[in-house]
């Protein structure tokens, strides 16, 4: 049966995803940035509250995946923290300036991660040669690759996803970006063994008082009176489809 990983931006969301049938949690902060490293406090709370495997993302900032020496040093420290807290895996990725997997840095990441299962995230979708990257990451010992098939959504990238799955079992190809109940059968039919979904929606803030004209965001149009949360019904429906597909 295919594995359902749900991207969560809080411990409360992780609890809801677990309750509704997720198999694994990717734990992140900052949904507007596509996911950044969660705080130490969130990580500790997740270890205490969640029984499912939780894989925190290690990503120091938004934007591209070519990092300064200081940023990369921080990543290694965060990886050691994730390992020391007892998580079974983590999600990360680095590229060089030419869009290739940064092999020297990935070797340091793998050494810092030790026994943890490492997922190479959607930095893969920005690399120059995905086929070579798949081979390189397999040689490095990366467990899985999260990918949209180098397209804006995994549905649009299904051709490359299918090709990479056919190339071999290692690293595992996990389809993600726009995966939901409505298109889940497409991925199951293609032989995808792991799918990744945010399965989420935006909820309004509980703030009754709102100060107009003052923003904490660099984007003056950002709506700061809402938060992203897992939609438990969406998770449950995806799990139902996966379970029925097995039979």
Curated annotation (Swiss-Prot):
Main location class: cytoplasm
Keyword field: Cytoplasm
Source species, domain of life: Bacteria
Classification via InterPro entries: CutC-like, CutC-like_dom_sf
Molecular-function GO term, any one: copper ion binding
Gene Ontology cellular component annotations, sorted alphabetically: cytoplasm
Location(s), subcellular: Cytoplasm
Family: Belongs to the CutC family.
Protein name (Swiss-Prot/TrEMBL): PF03932 family protein CutC
Protein's organism: Klebsiella pneumoniae subsp. pneumoniae (strain ATCC 700721 / MGH 78578)
